UniProtKB/Swiss-Prot annotation:
Gene: ATP23
Location in or out of the cell: Mitochondrion inner membrane
Keywords: Hydrolase, Membrane, Metal-binding, Metalloprotease, Mitochondrion, Mitochondrion inner membrane, Protease
Basic and acidic residues biased stretches: 7-21
Source organism of this protein record: Mycosarcoma maydis (Corn smut fungus)
Its EC number(s): 3.4.24.-
Topology of this chain in the membrane: Peripheral membrane protein
Entry protein name: Mitochondrial inner membrane protease ATP23
Length: 217
């Protein structure tokens, strides 16, 4: 996961982008129905993204130091991503996961809402189902759910990507986004055929699983 630039080393542009992302994030946690809903259901699983970090008094000093970072990390990123999910280590509670928000890749509050919601679905899956992220089928299932439920494949986002279409556009977008994510998994080794096959194998069951929603948002 990207590491935030120390504030005294930020360029003026990085400072502006970080502060804008921080403001939008605060506003979304107060006003976004989607973000508030996901926060509620993460909290029910003891994975509240806004809860205090663990301290050395509740863990070994080494472990606490290794994970001494906010649960919502705002930092500059490479051009290919807008956010990410960093799952907890196997030896840690699932609540010790974190979300990356790429301050230089978020172009609007709506984009941030979709990105944050996408990563919160991953966190929900990690807390609820104990996902093995090295298992391509597990990873594909969570990517399918996150792309489908978060708004990442909404009409406006697809139009902005210049993916024009109407028939099965949502499903096609979900598959495409899931395949791209699986390709980045070291267990896939960049094998597109393997990524596409894995997504196809789990698509129907995972696309139909809308938990914690009653239906697609």
């Amino acid at each position: 996961m990207a590491t935030p630039t120390p504030r005294h080393q930020e360029t003026p542009q990085e400072t502006t982008e970080r502060e804008r992302c921080e403001q939008w994030t605060d506003e979304l946690f107060r006003t976004s129905p989607m973000v508030r809903f996901m926060t509620k259901h993460l909290s029910l699983l003891d994975c509240n993204p806004l809860s205090p970090l663990r301290t050395a008094s509740s863990s070994s000093h080494a472990t606490a130091s290794a994970r001494a970072q906010p649960k919502l990390v705002i930092a500059p990123c490479p051009p290919s991503i807008a956010g990410g999910f960093s799952p907890s280590l196997r030896s840690e509670p699932t609540s010790e996961s974190s979300i990356l928000l790429c301050s230089n890749r978020i172009f609007s509050k709506a984009h941030l809402e979709d990105t944050l919601s996408h990563e919160m679905v991953h966190w929900f899956d990690h807390c609820r189902f104990l996902v093995d992220w090295s298992n391509l089928r597990h990873h594909a299932c969570s990517e399918i759910r996150a792309a489908s439920l978060s708004g990442d494949c909404g009409f406006v986002r697809e139009w902005q990507r210049r993916n024009y279409g109407f028939k099965l556009q949502h499903q096609n977008c979900v598959k495409r986004r899931a395949v791209l994510s699986i390709l980045a998994n070291p267990a896939c080794a960049g094998d597109r055929q393997k990524a596409e096959q894995t997504v196809d194998e789990v698509f129907q069951s995972c696309f139909g699983d809308t938990r914690p929603f009653d239906e697609i948002y």
